[in-house]
Structures are given as C-alpha cells and as structure tokens.
Amino acid sequence: MNYFRYKQFNKDVITVAVGYYLRYALSYRDISEILRGRGVNVHHSTVYRWVQEYAPILYQIWKKKHKKAYYKWRIDETYIKIKGKWSYLYRAIDAEGHTLDIWLRKQRDNHSAYAFIKRLIKQFGKPQKVITDQAPSTKVAMAKVIKAFKLKPDCHCTSKYLNNLIEQDHRHIKVRKTRYQSINTAKNTLKGIECIYALYKKNRRSLQIYGFSPCHEISIMLAS
C-alpha cells in the first residue's frame, strides 16, 4: 500500500518529520525549524497533520506484528491532561519490559481497567502473573478478570516496588509539554509515540541502540 500517494512532499521529508516528533520531545514548530535548516519549508500545522495521519497507521502495523508476550505482565496508568482535564493512559509491559499495549481513557475505574486487561488477553492470551499497583479499581478489575477468564486465584500481585519498571516507562510521556486539545488528538499522538518507543526499547534490549533511527523504522513499517 502506498501511504504517500498524492502528497506534496517527498516521503523522506514526511518520515523525518513524523519520526523526530514521535521519538523526541520536540514541538511541531521545532520540527518545522529543523526542516527549514535542511532547505525544506514545511509549516508546523502540516507537521501536525502528518503526525495525526501516520501515528495511528504505525500503531496498527506495530500491533499486527506484535503478537507474543512473556507470561508476566505489569500494568499501570498515568495522568494525561487534555484540554484542562485529566485523562488516564493505561500501559502494560511484559517481563522483559517490552510494551504490550496502551489505552487512553477518560475515567480511571474498574470498568476501564477490566476492558484494558480483557483487550490484552484477547491479543496475547492468558498471563500467569499480573503485577499492578494497589489502586482499588485495579483490584476489582483483576478479580473480575480472574473469574471471567478462569485464571489462577494467585496470579494477581499488588506491589508499589515490583511495579517500578513500568512506572519508568511513563517518563518519556511526562517530559513532553504537549497540550492536547481533544481526546482524539491525544489518542493518535500517543499511539505513535508509544509505537516508536516500543521499537526503541526492543533495539536497546537487543544491544542495537546505537543503530536506532525512528525515520528508518517508520520507512520499513510503511513499506511493508
């Protein structure tokens, strides 16, 4: 599939713009200035539209290829401000620290947590161990999951310290000062950011960190 058909700019320009934004804590204006320094004049609003268009595509391609997970999962959530109101980004990683999935919700309750875990099981199968924080909503959700999917009663472990690994994964989101104006904008952007970060972590754990290029990864994904 040609994802760059009828585009005014060359695909290399688009992949650089999208890759830089999704990988680094840069603004759309920063990306526009970087491209201008390379002799390419692109308005920052155009960069925004590219990110909104390609980030969900990259996320879907990544999810289709990402089907395996280790038996132990860690699940946590963090706060994301959207148009002045708090929303909640649920995140899951496996025993090796690889990202399983993310999900942005307006509410932090047992229904949201249950739906997220159910979604994970549908994609990766049943886990042997799930580590979460001690939030009451998560405990209720896990009790429902254990009953619904007939998991072992002791598969759920709550610990603030055992879950430190996944809390570190929130940092690359927290360092950004992005002001999201709608839930859809936030969803699209975060899907792209998490997709690239997941690929970065995979390269880092396979000792290929010095060869990681978000633009190269995007080119490969969109060429498949």
Swiss-Prot record:
Residues 73-222 form the Integrase catalytic domain. InterPro entries: DDE_dom (IPR032874), Integrase_cat-core (IPR001584), IS_Transposase (IPR052183), RNaseH-like_sf (IPR012337), RNaseH_sf (IPR036397), Transpos_IS6 (IPR047930). One of its GO terms (biological process) is DNA integration. Transmembrane segments: none annotated. Gene3D superfamilies: Ribonuclease H-like superfamily/Ribonuclease H (3.30.420.10). Residues 33-52 bind DNA. GO terms for molecular function: DNA binding. It comes from the Bacteria. Disulfide bonds: none annotated. Pfam families: DDE_Tnp_IS240 (PF13610). Keywords: DNA recombination, DNA-binding, Plasmid, Transposable element, Transposition. Involved in the transposition of the insertion sequence. NCBIfam families: transpos_IS6. This is Transposase for insertion sequence element IS257 in transposon Tn4003. It comes from Staphylococcus aureus. The lineage of its organism: Bacteria, Bacillati, Bacillota, Bacilli, Bacillales.
